[in-house]
Amino acid sequence: MARNRQPVLKKCRALGIDPVVLGVNKSSKRGPRPNANKKPTEYAVQLREKQKAKFIYNVMEKQFRKIYEEAARKLGVTGLTLIEYLERRLENVVYRLGFAKTRRQARQIVSHGHVAVNGRRVNIASYRVKVGDVISIIENSKNLDIIKTSVEDATVPAWLELDRAAFTGKVLQNPTKDDLDFDLNESLIVEFYSR
């Protein structure tokens, strides 16, 4: 399986992302790039927005394009549907429920089999949850320090519900753009793919 192994701070700096969005509490000591004051082209702005979404959600290009094409086929606004699909990925839901400090840690928790959806163990990070699904940590994994400490500090968005004592969460409704924890201009991504 292909994975992005670039240094997180370096990539955040290049894409203009605050590292706190990724759960990294560091900041780069380096100043702005020498050519940072050059006006980027329209293509460069669109590409950067797409790369930002891919990097934050930890999705490779082929999978991101499949998600976009699926969102484009569905009735409604393509950009908002794309955001909804990315937010409903299991690794992201585990992160948003507070079972992990970062999305990357959430991906590892899912792939190691610590998560169940509706009582069945799921180890596929890209699994898309639906409204009414119950996401829980399996019984043996509830004692893991990583999960315990993460749940204590969790702030859960309005589209999810968390039961801290039982280590379970429920999807109440589909996420919207307002539920994002970072700035994303989805229309630039749609423009990029519709060239």
What are the residue ranges of the model-derived segments?
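Short, well-ordered loop/turn sites that connect or cap secondary structure elements
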Residues: 100-103, 109-110, 129
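Ferredoxin-like alpha/beta domains used as RNA- or RNAP-binding modules
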Residues: 1-97, 124-195
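Short, surface-exposed recognition loops or helix-turn segments adjacent to catalytic cores
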Residues: 104-108, 120-125
